[in-house]
A protein has these predicted regions:
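Residue-level signal for inorganic ion chemistry
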Residues: 34, 72, 96, 115, ...
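Short, acidic (Asp/Glu-rich) active-site segment that either coordinates a divalent metal cofactor
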Residues: 134-164
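Acidic (Asp/Glu) carboxylate-rich active-site/surface patches
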Residues: 98-133, 140-141
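A generic structural motif
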Residues: 50-52, 75, 117, 129, ...
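Conserved, helical-rich catalytic subdomain that frames metal- and/or nucleotide-binding sites
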Residues: 164-219, 257-260
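Conserved RNA-binding domains used in RNP assembly and mRNA/RNA metabolism
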Residues: 208-260
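N-terminal lobe of the biotin/lipoate ligase/transferase fold
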Residues: 1-105, 208, 257-258
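Gly/Ser/Thr-rich beta-alpha loop segments that engage phosphate groups in nucleotides
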Residues: 53-62, 127, 141-145, 230
Length: 260
């Protein structure tokens, strides 16, 4: 177990923007799922694996996790009322996007709720689980040097990797440090401002109407132009008549971008 993040003394010198959290980092060569390992770990502990055999995304979807990518999960405290953490995945997505842009990935953008894309191809994604009261598990996966389409040819038209967008590519240790710092910042911001501040930041990324198709948990499918989030976190869509309607975010199983 190692400390992946700078010490508190370094924090005081300004390296951590006053977010003085010392993460304990466990590094594994291979595991089934870093999220599963994190379930039994205390807050501010993270697990990184070189590869996963049963990585997963939202709704239990399989997530390719080859060696050369960044596969990371972190255990965070969920203190206070449950409503404080409603929409935390959106807050995390905004913080991670800001961080990736800061290291030179200017092409990065966010697809609701928290997929990170470059162009039309998926670079990274995250999943947030709450296995126990008072605990949040954030799982983050990003293609870095790996080529996911070699194991999953169906990803050849939909996936990308960091090495195709920036050079030189930061090493996995440096990337891990930056991601954990972004998670700590998202946690602090959520406690301070909840969802309203996150929604404002997210809507600043979603400035142009985007044609989408949304699959709902009821089995229905709706189409419209995605306009961002309403103050309550629901999705705002513009229909063909020019009317704006809301889609409740808990009912959304998948959002697919359409050709404009």
């Amino acid at each position: 177990m190692t400390h992946a993040i700078k010490s508190e003394r370094e924090c005081q010198r300004g390296f951590r923007k006053n977010l003085c959290v010392n993460w304990d980092l466990i590094h594994l060569a291979e595991t089934t799922s870093t999220n599963d390992i994190c379930r039994d770990l205390p807050a501010w502990t993270a697990v990184r694996a070189d590869s996963q055999t049963r990585g997963r995304g939202r709704f239990g979807r399989a997530f390719a996790s080859q060696k050369g990518g960044l596969w990371l999960s972190a255990s965070l405290p969920a203190t206070g009322p449950a409503e404080v953490w409603a929409g935390f995945s959106l807050r995390v997505g905004a913080s991670l996007l800001t961080h990736l842009k800061s290291i030179g990935l200017t092409a990065a953008r966010l697809r609701w709720p928290n997929d990170i894309l470059c162009g039309s191809r998926k670079l990274a994604g995250l999943i947030i689980e709450q296995p126990a009261s008072g605990q949040l598990i954030v799982g983050f996966g990003m293609n870095v040097l790996n080529e996911p389409w070699t194991d999953s040819p169906e990803l050849s038209d939909t996936a990308t990797r960091l090495a195709d967008w920036i050079s030189p590519v930061p090493d996995l240790e440096t990337l891990t440090t930056g991601i954990l710092e972004a998670l700590a910042e998202a946690h602090t911001q959520m406690l301070a401002g909840g969802m309203p501040a996150a929604i404002e930041e997210l809507n600043a990324h979603w400035t142009e109407p985007l044609p989408v198709e949304i699959s709902l948990s009821s089995g229905r499918t709706v189409r419209g132009s995605f306009l961002g989030l309403a103050p309550n976190g629901h999705l705002q869509l513009l229909d063909q008549t020019g009317s704006v309607f809301l889609v409740e975010h808990p009912t959304v199983e998948r959002l697919r971008e359409l050709e404009g």
